[in-house]
């Protein structure tokens, strides 16, 4: 497979070899290569008989690439592909249903799981575990069964049918994976519901056997969730990538070596370094135990060297890292190490920031695809250790353990320190030693005798720390009865911010519900039986009565269906001098009220409807106040209105008077001006066509309003027009005009006979006065109120009618209209003088008592009482029986009883009343029936007492276990009476919904269990977790961190609840940390703690952690060192956390990518005190910049600035970048640009983004300016031939900077050279002379600059370069 033709065995066709080797080195290499190649060609091909799966294929391709370069690898991969397809075709590999073979072990595994789950349910029934623990155990049981089934599937295929198509496909990694094959031939497994909670009913079948209907529905849940998640996560992942690119886009390799002596320490993990050292440079000598130097400083570590370190048992290596690189605003080649694309030092100008961002962001999309193939939960990543010998357990003197309850409800112990546990055999043999790590769970105790193959310990995994979230689960009652607390629970009342009181359990314990028949009592029902009294079936237990609130006349509606409504008329009012008349129109019924004198009121409601306070009952139908057209309103002195205007009804008249009306006709047109048929200011007669199809109704002067050639309005003002030359008169009436009384002189020869409104008008005939008629309307002081008859109960609500006059318009208002308007409305308004806002009044039509033909309007207020109907026994209310105590038409007084309801007993038993709570009436009562108790007669003497609670299996007498759960009610001789019950376990901090002694119905909530669940270790949580880390989010309830190192002392508060952890520091200072309830303390008395160590469990706040590190170091070190060290500690932590999330998903990302991002997040500090520098307090500045400023201050003797390091999330870091163009293109564009403008910022265009936006060459790769400068410096000064050349050799712009040539000073008249098309041979010669790789496309690969500025002679440009080019035919003379 690996034999290739001798021709393709050139040592390497790699394009980018470093020139930084010295001359002697390169000559030696050439010699070696020359000697190696003939031998290489003669090596016979080696054949290896081995299965090549995905992993082996990866290694093969990597080896080929490394030893033979790209071209050979590509052709080899092609040959392999052809080989594979050819044999697959010949073997006819395809998949049929027959290939899906279900392992025989499946049935046994399912039976075992069922048995385990039955046992778990039994534990829950006996109150040994909580609902949450039951759920967790069920889910873990199924998950474990699933895993074992996968193993069975693998084993089945491997042993019985290794060439099965499905197995080959999944096993080779060609397509699909085991989790999918498992669903085809194992079981589909657990599914999650749309809320993301796992349904504890798994899908036991697989797709080969077929799903039941229920399973199919559940399966679709999971599948849908997978699809939706994928869609959402793709978007999330893309956004994460965008933010990462934004924060790191200006990180470019700009220097060869920054010269730093700092580095980071990489420690051995799982017995080796793996690939974590490969591609890095050592920051210090690496010396083995014997003092032999294995690697000097700045040595590139390749895989063989890494292996050598491992062999020499080296535990940690200090390597250079982007985190500690001191290059300004970039990283240097030595700190960055290899560019992983071609496993060599990164080139200058390589945009490593963007590569890092894409490397971290890209797996996000992949990871999301793995959401639900695995069916929800990942198994616990913990190692269980079983005993290998039978014997005695010894913990040893170092051990420190504390009690712990596992998620499955098992009692265990958790180790607080690392120690070694020994199992000493009872007979002969070697003792078993087990290393216990902190946090491991021990299922045995010190000195315990155990058998072989017993679970001893569950070792805590140091894998990814999954983030936890608080979740709740309800405990629902399965039977009706009375609640009893166990003493252990110790409920306490907790007040929240709103002042609501909740009851919480403090300790783990049980709530009991003792069986009985519970009756819910209706409101205002009172028990009529005493406690502990025997009651018979059908006996009245409680009675409720319903009374009238106000009293009045009773109306009984005919019992329509089950509605039992009793109405009582409490207040009524009849309008006795109005007849009620109704008429039918096509738009519905119209009702009128007619008075004796003939005035009519329009009714605004209809009989049978309801109206509320302040609503209009009727309106006077009166045409006296109706105008012919629109016009202008003027109030004569004396007429007064209320200021406020109600939206619909206009202004209420306070005092009557005269209203003056000046009519004017307004046509609103909104048509083109060309349709106008008259002129502005023209006098027209009534009936004139003013615009096509629109006629004037009155005679008068026309005013035309137009805008942008659109005709808006035409106003016709009627009256008589008089030309006038008297200036004084014209001025007097110009503008708003004036009202002139009869007999007054208006101007010379113009007198008013009636009241007129005079205005000065300019018309085509000339200026004059327009005398407009004024109409007068007299408004009375008060409206007429009809006579009413009242009937009212003493306590009942009041009813009244108020007559009001309302004006539609205020003084000076102009009404634009052609039709007339109603100026005054007289309305009858309902008034109820009652406190209840929701009270409504019924409108009724009644016959007059004397004249039966006449109908009158009556308004009534009804009190409606709903009477309960009889129910035959229902489960919670018992049987009820209701009796009415009144008849139709009867008159009742306030608080008279209308109906009584009795609650009847369903089964005989002993009635009991609950203990009433303060202020709470009795809402329920319980009858303890014969079937709720059981009497057991024991053989021996009883071992139990009255009041004791027992569960199945507890001893009643010697060797006589109880067969049920309950409370002992009495013991007489050997007869024990038990009241049946059911225990429910509640965990600490659960919210209790019931109090001791309360009565509950089946289905009531007893408690709300609060628990922490791990956010599933699925990347569904992985992406948000990475986002949380990179955005440096502050967790809601973070862990308490130790601020200064010292010794721990734990103090209990007086109330036995609050805990305070005190840390006695080195200088005997005491740090106090109060611990909130419900928090687990992670330290023990006398333990030594460091700064930043966790005192309680919970997520860590990274900002707080940085402060802890910095504050601690600041006391012992100079400011700069403290900041650098604190940042380094945090950086290490962040890199590890991000790596853990990806590793848990099996995604490998090189550390350096994460380091580049983390470096950007931690590069800034906040100035606290500026000292004598020009910095501002609160400003965010690069650490390097502050360092330089403070060094300058040290030289000049000024006060340096004080600062604290800050951690910025990626979004914040992007917005705080030096380049405002880049920040503005990311988010909050306006804010960023305005701030930059106000501060007068400059953008130095250092990054890629800002250059792309402005349209310049990006400073990476070939556009990297530093690169060009360096080459120019090597080549010596050259004039730019293109800059001074007007003829323009544009094609020479494609040449690289190291391609510039010396121009000899030519005489003025001399001819200039012009580029000719070179022949292939010429090009070859030129390329070889300038060191250009022929494999690269047109001059695309260029020589890498050297490190030590050593150049081989043949690389230097020839002083007579121009002549050389001419001789080669590249330049011709014209």
From Swiss-Prot:
Keyword Metal-binding carried by entry: yes
Broad class of enzyme this protein falls into: transferase
Q: Which cofactor does it need?
A: Zn(2+)
Free-text cofactor note: Binds 1 Zn(2+) ion per subunit.
Signal peptide extent: none
Gene3D superfamilies (UniProt xref): 1.10.132.30, 1.10.150.390, 1.10.1790.20, 2.40.50.100, RNA polymerase Rpb1, domain 3
Q: What GO molecular function annotations does the UniProt record carry, in alphabetical order?
A: DNA binding; DNA-directed RNA polymerase activity; zinc ion binding
GO cellular component terms, A-Z:
DNA-directed RNA polymerase complex
- What's the EC number here? 2.7.7.6
Kindly state which keywords UniProt assigns to this record, in alphabetical order.
Answer: DNA-directed RNA polymerase, Metal-binding, Nucleotidyltransferase, Transcription, Transferase, Zinc
Query: Region Disordered: which residues?
Result: 1-47, 1343-1374
Q: Where is the composition biased (Low complexity)?
A: 29-45, 1362-1374
Q: Which SUPFAM superfamilies match?
A: beta and beta-prime subunits of DNA dependent RNA-polymerase
Q: Which positions bind Zn(2+)?
A: 258, 325, 332, 335
A Gene Ontology BP annotation from the UniProt entry: DNA-templated transcription
Write out the catalysed reaction: RNA(n) + a ribonucleoside 5'-triphosphate = RNA(n+1) + diphosphate
Residue stretches of biased makeup (Basic residues): 7-28
Pfam families, sorted: RNA_pol_Rpb1_3, RNA_pol_Rpb1_4, RNA_pol_Rpb1_5
> What's this protein's function?
DNA-dependent RNA polymerase catalyzes the transcription of DNA into RNA using the four ribonucleoside triphosphates as substrates.
Tell me how this protein assembles.
Answer: In cyanobacteria the RNAP catalytic core is composed of 2 alpha, 1 beta, 1 beta', 1 gamma and 1 omega subunit. When a sigma factor is associated with the core the holoenzyme is formed, which can initiate transcription.
Which family does the similarity line name? Answer: Belongs to the RNA polymerase beta' chain family. RpoC2 subfamily.
Its protein name is: DNA-directed RNA polymerase subunit beta'
- What's the gene? rpoC2
